Amino acid sequence: MPLEIDLFAIERGSITAPAGCGKTQLIAETLIAHRQSKPILVLTHTNAGVAALRARLRRAGVPNSAYRVSTIDGFSMRLIAKFPARSGHNPQILQLHQPNTDYPAIRHAAMLLLQAGHLAQPLRATYARLLVDEYQDCNVVQHAIVSGLAQVLPTCVLGDPMQAIFDFRGNRLVHWANEVQPLFPAAGELRIPWRWRLAGAENLGQWLLAIRQQLQVGQPVDLRTAPAEVRWVQLNAGTEVQQRLVAARTESPNARGSVLIIGDSINVQGRHQLTSQTPGAMAVEAVDLRDLVNFARNFNLQGANALAQLAEFASSVMTGVGAANLRTRVESLRTGRARTPPTPAEAEAVAFVGEPTPQRALLVLNALAEQPGARVYRPEVLHCCRSAMQAVAGGTADFLSAAIQARERNRHLARSIARRSVGSTLLLKGLEADVSVVLHPELMTAQNLYVALTRGARHVVVCSSNPILMPVNNG
């Protein structure tokens, strides 16, 4: 079967790839068809994205020899490390002790190294061509890095300006029409909504392609024109919270199907509360695992509030802890005033207060998670915390260092998504499920709204007071 677009015919160009239209499959088929001895270099943005792409390529039977896949930042690190004299960078930046400043310094050094033109020969000797995935997520310096590589290698960039949602905290994304296409001329657009066709929901896929055009030119989305696969939950004043909770419990139309619940990107606490109240739901975490790192930084085993800190942390990742009641019970048990014997979790908590060690803290967390009726709804955070506590108990690191190490290991894993997951558009972009539930469309830009609506392959649920969704302006 011929490729939908022949990427080998593109010397330098860009492919516009709307959500669910087979971009990853096109990359896989291109790599399968690759016959040269030199591999194709494939760059993307996140370590989780790299892991997911590798897994997809393995499933497609793509031989490892056909490609090298990396993040743009990871490739930049290896590049300047291989040519330190020419790069002239401070070697300390490769240690990533200060990621907020080290990554920009690494990108800047790689950009200058490529712009100097010294690497043309080694790059041509190593790679056949370059493909860059999710190009809309590039900031201007990453765009300059890819532009430098494109001076040497045949290059095709693939992405969708309607999914450019990482433009925050001063991270200026490259503009598709003004900056990408002048350097990488338009070479094609994917137009078949494969995600929905394969799920038997072609009407939904075609509608999403149509509203993409509307959103792109600043028009609203009218849910009254949507196909039957889209369900509008009309929110009523005073009952919005309950209605959203009910919507979050929407079942997938297929057996063992998956549901993505897309909440408010700003109100993280609100998302976690909804996750804790939704049976079977689990939170999708930001890669920085900030709550874990803050807990590790502040947890004082020898402090008077050690049990309170531990219980509060447990309450933030699982249900059924009852932090205040646990502390009261421990005090009663320790003073001999308790009328009922301790539960296993209470017994571990009493032992922890008497001997506040990392091992004891870990036993408390494990016992709380195993209580009848308890449910861990932030498993990633708990897993990394357990891993860090085990490292501390083994004497290999302090808690903060161990937590950061656990986080960095976790960052390189392909994300394992629960059958019912809760997150924001930023956290769920690139993922798909049978059903997407959009809880706060009124807070979304056109790009965020498009990303949210395109996560569900069979069914989309939208909660709003008005059937006409008017995106908010960027910025």
Please provide the spans of the model-predicted regions:
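The feature marks helicase ATPase cores and/or their adjacent C-terminal helical subdomains
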Residues: 1-475
